[in-house]
């Protein structure tokens, strides 16, 4: 294997991670659909090292090991290891989770099947729509005679139920995991906990309960979230166990943390118990890295644009805080756990261009993946992709090898597009490649609108931050489509997700179902309850090695107007909280989201929330020195706006801090290529981040 070992930016931090580090390296590894990226902070020299290797579907842990080998560091010298994985997502989408049983309250066996009145997939007008079935077969949905009232009173205890017989039945049925979901358990989980305790005495299987996953109102969403967790737990635990064994077998004895969907890191044990908290384990790292870029460059508001080989992920960052969603959907299943508000579409470098039945050109969502990959990879792929289109248009290098020693084959790309052209009445392949990019850009612009306009924000008030292996190639076109005034391209854009993982704080989310109309509540009661929550979370973080002065706790309340069925989260400060400030904050949030507020209506509190973080120190990335080197390494013709334009090719490592230039230009670096269209003005920040001004922005 050819070792790719490149060092660049220096990292200046007073003390790494806020703790004494006996060893040398901090490592972040992000597994994507096409590539596995690794970024490493070398503590002694404060340098960043990076590498990129192909992902291995079905063997993610092997890709992780290959990334470590490619980087060329000693495993024994790794002191912290954070990993983003797509194991949970893949298991659900491919329906390869565990055989799961549901133990529920008598009369609620079919809650998962009944669901809600709206379709979660398929579209409202799809006449061929077939509703996906629940993850638990009906014969494995077992009712028990228990009942708890909505106020938490135990109406029917569960002590007398025969769990020995139930355990024997589940064992004979080949069940691999169990979800215990009782009605109103959010108000009092006593019966659920007793059932879990009894089942664990009879079965050596994972058993989870709904109030332990989502202690909130709404049995359908709570049941669905718990069943998802049970369905995925054996798969996630098996992967994490294999990963730990393989890493230890190769000398890695440092703690291994997993990125959570909420944007923070968690221990292997936490990830094994809370599998549904890892659905966005990969994409959230990029958002975390983007937040760090914003902090270093004094940018308050940005929209992340993370384009890889398989998909594009976008998220909105307001006041350097990514938005959190508590009411989510994965595939056809509701998931009511906190995760970053990331919108994903099937448009990546490997997305396949194809012709629909009506003869129109389409791009994605199907992808060529890592194997065989785009035609230009020379690994047996024959279908035209977005990467092939970029190569045909001159945006990717032919002579220069990419990360991992990959050398692109333009002839293979042209052959793939020639076959596509035959289905479109012999269209010119250059124009066809340009059309493929335009279709992809339109879809990606729609994704940006989804997280901004649809949430009450104007994208023109934000910078567009492009990263991922393919993000910097397309982010400028998306910015022109939306009239976004500024594009930001960080250093190491292809490894920003790994950087976000490396720098991730440890995070814990807690929720308490408590509330009512404000006029009927006591402020002292609210404050006493959040004090209890804070002490519990403080103890958990202290147990994970974070001193009290390395912890941060933030509170919010879920509120709604009387008669509404949905809530909005309103931040609160313990020392400044009043009912008037809560009403005002909720009204402002409601108006921002929905365009109006109703000051005549009563407000209600539904939940209390706590977000706790164990803080790690963040390095400040800077160039070691300015230089007077010429970054231009060659020139070639690039297709822009319907014509071939002579364009300078720049080596990013040679670009001096505080230098400026005007496009067109191609900026090449390990792990990413930036395509700067004509007339865009580019400035190099001290951190190496590119600030690019849109000449076509609208006021």
PLM segments and residue spans:
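N-terminal glycine/serine-rich phosphate-binding loop of ATP-dependent small-molecule kinases
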Residues: 2-100, 149, 156-179, 192-210, ...
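C-terminal, non-catalytic interaction/recognition modules in large multi-subunit enzymes and RNPs
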Residues: 31, 161-165, 169, 299, ...
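Glycine-rich phosphate-binding loop of actin/hexokinase-like ATP-binding domains
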Residues: 38, 49-56, 101-107, 268, ...
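Gly-rich Lys/Arg/Thr-decorated short loops/hinges at beta-loop-alpha junctions or inter-strand turns
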Residues: 41-49, 122-125, 135-154, 175, ...
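Phosphate-binding loop and its immediate beta->loop->alpha context
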Residues: 48-72, 108, 132-166, 176-177, ...
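ATP-dependent carbohydrate kinase catalytic cores
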Residues: 61, 67-71, 211-218, 222-225, ...
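Active-site phosphate-binding/coordination module
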Residues: 98-152, 210-214, 500
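Terminal amphipathic helices with adjacent charged low-complexity linkers/tails
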Residues: 181-222, 612-625
């Amino acid at each position: 294997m050819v070792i790719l070992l490149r060092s660049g930016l220096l990292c200046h931090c007073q003390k790494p991670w806020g703790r004494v580090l006996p060893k040398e390296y901090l490592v972040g590894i992000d597994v994507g659909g096409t590539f596995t990226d690794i970024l490493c902070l070398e503590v002694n020299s404060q340098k960043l090292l990076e590498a990129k290797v192909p992902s291995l579907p079905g063997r993610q842990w092997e890709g992780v090991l290959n990334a470590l080998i490619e980087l060329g560091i000693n495993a024994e010298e790794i002191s912290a290891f954070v990993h983003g994985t797509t194991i949970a997502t893949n298991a659900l989408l491919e329906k390869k989770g565990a055989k799961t049983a549901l133990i529920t309250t008598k009369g609620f066996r079919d809650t998962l099947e009944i669901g809600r009145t709206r379709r979660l997939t398929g579209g409202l007008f799809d006449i061929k729509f077939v509703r996906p079935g629940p993850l638990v077969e009906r014969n494995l949905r077992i009712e028990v005679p228990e009942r708890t009232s909505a106020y938490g009173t135990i109406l029917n205890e569960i002590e007398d139920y025969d769990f020995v017989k139930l355990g024997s039945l589940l064992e004979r049925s080949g069940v691999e995991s169990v979800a215990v979901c009782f009605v109103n358990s959010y108000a009092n989980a006593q019966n659920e906990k007793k059932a879990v305790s009894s089942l664990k005495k009879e079965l050596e299987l994972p058993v989870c309960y709904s109030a332990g996953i989502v202690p909130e109102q709404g049995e359908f969403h709570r049941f669905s979230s718990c069943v998802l967790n049970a369905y995925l737990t054996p798969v996630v635990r098996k992967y994490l166990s294999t990963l730990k064994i393989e890493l230890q077998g190769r000398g890695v004895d440092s703690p291994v943390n997993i990125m959570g969907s909420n944007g923070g890191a968690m221990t292997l044990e936490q990830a094994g118990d809370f599998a549904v908290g890892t659905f966005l384990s990969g994409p959230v790292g990029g958002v975390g890295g983007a937040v760090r870029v914003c902090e270093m460059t004094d940018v308050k508001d940005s929209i992340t644009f993370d384009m890889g080989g398989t998909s594009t992920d976008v998220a909105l960052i307001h006041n350097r805080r990514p938005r959190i969603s508590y009411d989510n959907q994965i595939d056809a299943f509701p998931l009511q756990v906190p995760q970053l508000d990331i919108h994903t579409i099937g448009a990546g470098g490997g997305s396949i261009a194809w012709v629909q039945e009506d003869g129109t050109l389409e791009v994605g969502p199907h992808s060529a993946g890592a194997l065989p990959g785009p035609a230009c990879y020379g690994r047996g792929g024959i279908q035209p992709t977005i990467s092939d289109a970029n190569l045909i248009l001159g945006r990717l290098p032919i002579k220069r090898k990419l990360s991992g020693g990959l050398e692109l084959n333009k002839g293979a790309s042209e052959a793939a597009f020639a076959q596509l052209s035959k289905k479109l009445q012999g269209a010119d392949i250059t124009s066809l490649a340009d059309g493929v990019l335009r279709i992809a850009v339109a879809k990606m612009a729609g994704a940006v609108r989804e997280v901004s306009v649809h949430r009450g924000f104007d994208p023109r008030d934000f910078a567009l931050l492009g990263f991922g292996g393919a993000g910097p190639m397309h982010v400028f076109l998306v910015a022109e489509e939306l009239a976004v005034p500024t594009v930001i391209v960080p250093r190491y854009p292809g490894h920003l997700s790994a950087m976000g993982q490396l720098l991730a704080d440890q995070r814990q989310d807690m929720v308490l179902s408590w509330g009512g109309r404000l006029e009927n509540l006591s402020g002292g009661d609210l404050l006493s309850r959040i004090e209890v929550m804070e002490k519990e979370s403080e103890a958990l973080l202290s147990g994970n090695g974070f001193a009290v002065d390395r912890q941060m706790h933030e509170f919010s309340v879920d509120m709604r107007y009387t008669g509404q069925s949905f809530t909005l989260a309103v931040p609160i400060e313990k020392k400044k909280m009043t009912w008037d400030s809560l009403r005002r904050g909720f009204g402002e949030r409601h108006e921002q989201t929905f365009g109006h507020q109703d000051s005549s209506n009563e407000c209600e509190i539904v939940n209390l929330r706590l977000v706790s973080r164990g803080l790690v120190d963040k390095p400040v990335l800077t160039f070691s020195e300015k230089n007077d080197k010429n970054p231009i390494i060659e020139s070639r013709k690039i297709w822009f706006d319907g014509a071939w334009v002579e364009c300078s090719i720049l080596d990013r490592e040679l670009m001096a801090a505080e230098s400026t230039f005007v496009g067109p230009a191609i900026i090449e670096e390990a792990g990413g290529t930036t395509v700067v269209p004509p007339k865009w003005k580019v400035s190099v920040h001290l951190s190496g981040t590119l600030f690019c001004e849109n000449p076509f922005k609208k006021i």
